[in-house]
Amino acid sequence: LYRLLNPKKCSLKHTLVHRHALIDALLARSTCRQVVEIAAGFSPRGCMVSADQAYRYFEVDLPEVIALKRKRLEESVAGRVVLSRENFKLLVGDITTLDFLLHFPKAPTFVITEGIMMYFKRDAQLAIWRNIAQFLRVHGGEYVFDYIPLEDEPPRSLPGQLLSDLRQRLVKPPPP
């Protein structure tokens, strides 16, 4: 039963690849042509999407991350091509203040925070979400994120609750 609930083929790598692909699909369906990826890290999404000149792509991260990504992109011909695009920008910004959001052109914007929100305490998450909501009220657009705090999950159905309880019992470590 454990293998049924946790198949080995469902690794963290597969989960991350599927999450990334889902966000890519949502972006492809969106009418927004301005994208702001907050805490982009080494995501290749901006490099790929900005190949289409119809998009303006802004990657935002901490200074050290932006410097390292720029350095890595400068090391290859393909990376230098990406950096030379007018519609691709690497920007320094702090997700906890979101002051950088004030400087984007006013256009419907697709905002992404992938793989970052889980690292913040509840109060910080709410502040970030309020800032992004305010930005989208002015610019219009969509917000995609991959994290729902447990206290905000909808209640499970009875079968879902039973499966969850059973799963927790199965994966519970044995007593010492």
Task: Say what each PLM segment does.
Residues 1-176:
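Alpha-helical subdomain
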